[in-house]
Amino acid sequence: MLKRDMTIAGYDPELWQAITDETRRQEEHIELIASENYTSPRVMEAQGSQLTNKYAEGYPSKRYYGGCEYVDVVETLAIERAKELFGATYANVQPHSGSQANSAVYMALLQPGDTVLGMNLAHGGHLTHGSPVNFSGKLYNIIPYGIDESGKIDYDDMERQAVEHKPKMMIGGFSAYSGIVDWARMREIADKVGAWLFVDMAHVAGLIAAGVYPNPVPHAHVVTSTTHKTLAGPRGGLILSAADDEELYKKLNSAVFPGGQGGPLMHVIAGKAVAFKEALEPEFKTYQAQVVKNAKAMAATFIERGYKIVSGGTDNHLMLVDLIGRELTGKEADAALGKANITVNKNSVPNDPRSPFVTSGVRIGTPAITRRGFKEAESIQLTNWICDVLDNHDNDAVLATVREQVLDICRRFPVYA
């Protein structure tokens, strides 16, 4: 018999200490990694529920195990809410991650060796969009597109490459691009060469759900996303479509299960269902609008302080600070800010002369600070602290002063009150 009062704290103090330390770190550090966010206690409640015990291979009403009547309800709720949120006619909520969702799309639509047009990782793309170290770059013939000298996606070059190489699939989406993507233009190019248009909206899904960033679902054949990042749900993946193509939907379902996964994680799917319900609330739209306002305020402040922002600013939740020409690498900037309790990630910038392990930039995002309650004033103050650290990265006194200021603002804006 399992007793409900069994706890980690009294049984595994080493593990509990690590959990406690991480909880304190999240409360006492300012989180600016663009792909991170704070999920709600409701989502964590779902993820810690008895649903974790249930195997449910298959799909609602078509399972390979008995006893699935209640998890069918859970998954159906998640599916219907996802479709409502993004204007889709199809949703698969089973992918364990965004990368596995992307893998399923490749499996459903392509054969190994097929040509794919995807955004260059060095220009803001993602590993799964064709990086040579990823399955996508190993199994398929990848033709990269990128940004022009202004830092914007070069659609004319994209079209030229599409006409020349005749890809079977084109990929839209990014992990480090601060502009607005013209999904309609991408679909025009895809249609011109007879390619599938697949969009990975993982980074901007929350903004899209709230209507503050263009929705790719009406334009793409298939759309994938993570369910965390700006969407602020549990860590997981999602596949959507509004193509009204039942054969396509069957291929996508089969590519997830049994093609790439076994049993779905029902406790995570329950967390997705809760997160989708939260994203349908009016407050979520207010939150996402503030995410963009805060990002714009930060980008403008960086520029005022003499720092270069790739693309000249931001229209979403993130920005890339370009450190080329400064006596400071992305790795050093990351480390210095960490000493001041500000968490970012080093990131390559276009035409970066340094390796991906060192880089000449840092990526900054506002979803997590906005979740804490930061508005423009706090975002501007924070950016000035960041610039103080970068300007004085080898000055321990400056780092210590900024750290105390960070601790103070974190106390005033707790993650979980």
Curated annotation (Swiss-Prot):
One of its GO terms (molecular function) is glycine hydroxymethyltransferase activity. InterPro entries: PyrdxlP-dep_Trfase, PyrdxlP-dep_Trfase_major, PyrdxlP-dep_Trfase_small, Ser_HO-MeTrfase, Ser_HO-MeTrfase-like, Ser_HO-MeTrfase_PLP_BS, SHMT-like_dom. (6S)-5,6,7,8-tetrahydrofolate binds at L121, G125, H126, L127, S355, P356, F357. The keyword Ubl conjugation does not apply. Keywords: Amino-acid biosynthesis, Cytoplasm, One-carbon metabolism, Pyridoxal phosphate, Transferase. It catalyses: (6R)-5,10-methylene-5,6,7,8-tetrahydrofolate + glycine + H2O = (6S)-5,6,7,8-tetrahydrofolate + L-serine. Signal peptide: none annotated. Its EC number is 2.1.2.1. Pathway: One-carbon metabolism; tetrahydrofolate interconversion; Amino-acid biosynthesis; glycine biosynthesis; glycine from L-serine: step 1/1. Pfam families: SHMT. It comes from the Bacteria. GO terms for cellular component: cytosol. It is found in: Cytoplasm. Its main location: cytoplasm. The modification N6-(pyridoxal phosphate)lysine is found at K229. The record marks H228 as: Plays an important role in substrate specificity. Its cofactor is pyridoxal 5'-phosphate. One of its GO terms (biological process) is tetrahydrofolate interconversion. Belongs to the SHMT family. Homodimer. Catalyzes the reversible interconversion of serine and glycine with tetrahydrofolate (THF) serving as the one-carbon carrier. This reaction serves as the major source of one-carbon groups required for the biosynthesis of purines, thymidylate, methionine, and other important biomolecules. Also exhibits THF-independent aldolase activity toward beta-hydroxyamino acids, producing glycine and aldehydes, via a retro-aldol mechanism. HAMAP family: SHMT (MF_00051). NCBIfam families: PRK00011.1. This is Serine hydroxymethyltransferase.
